[in-house]
Each structure stands twice: as structure tokens, then as C-alpha cells.
Amino acid sequence: MVFQKAKERENGAWVPGLWRLEVANVLQMNVNRRRHRTTFRDAALADLALLPIHLDGDTDRHAWDETLRLAERHELTVYDAAYLELALRRKIALATLDRQLRAAAAREGVQLLGA
């Protein structure tokens, strides 16, 4: 359902510059743990490549300042705070199922998709 919604959005979705590494890591860890085969991983990556996803080129520039402050303020991982920082900076809605990140976004006044 999330992928279908992403395909339907004209402008696509913005993600932090670390997104591809996070996705690749999750898929590879599932291969390493024998939960999925490499064919599944590769097919998932091919499907994701078709989505209108835009990588933010400024994620790292904010890592040691605003992203870190958000992580500290809301007790988030720096990785999760990067998504919140991006939503704040670009003034875009945030799509996440993570309860703690959703709460932090609400406190920061960020619109949540699916809310």
C-alpha cells in the first residue's frame, strides 16, 4: 500500500541521503539471517528503483547540528532524526510507522501521512 501511494504521488517522496544504505542493510541482514534469498533482495531493490524517490543531498550537512539536536530533544536515533530534519527543512509531510518518530514529528508540527 505504501509503495502504491508513492507511485501515485506526482512529486514522489524525499528521503535522507542515507536511505539507500538503510534499505540495503535491512535487505542484506534478512539474507544473512536466511529470512530471504538474494533473489528477493534483488527484486525488492528493482521495485524500489521504480518509485519516484528523491535522495536529499544535504542530509550530511545537517547531521552534526539540527539532526543531532532533534535526536537529543526527542530521544531518537540520529537516523530517525534525519527523517524528521528533512521533513522540517523541506516543509513536507512525514511517512513513518515508528511511534516515537511520529510523536516527535507531531511535537515539531510536522504533518504525518496517514494521520
Residue ranges and their predicted role:
Residues 1-19, 30, 34-43, 108:
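Short, well-structured N-terminal submotif of metal-dependent ribonuclease cores
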Residues 16, 20, 84-115:
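Acidic, PIN/NYN-like endoribonuclease modules and their adjacent C-terminal/linker elements
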Residues 24-56, 64-66:
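Active-site-proximal, substrate-binding regions of enzyme catalytic domains
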Residues 53-100:
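Active-site neighborhoods of divalent-metal-dependent phosphate/nucleic-acid chemistry enzymes
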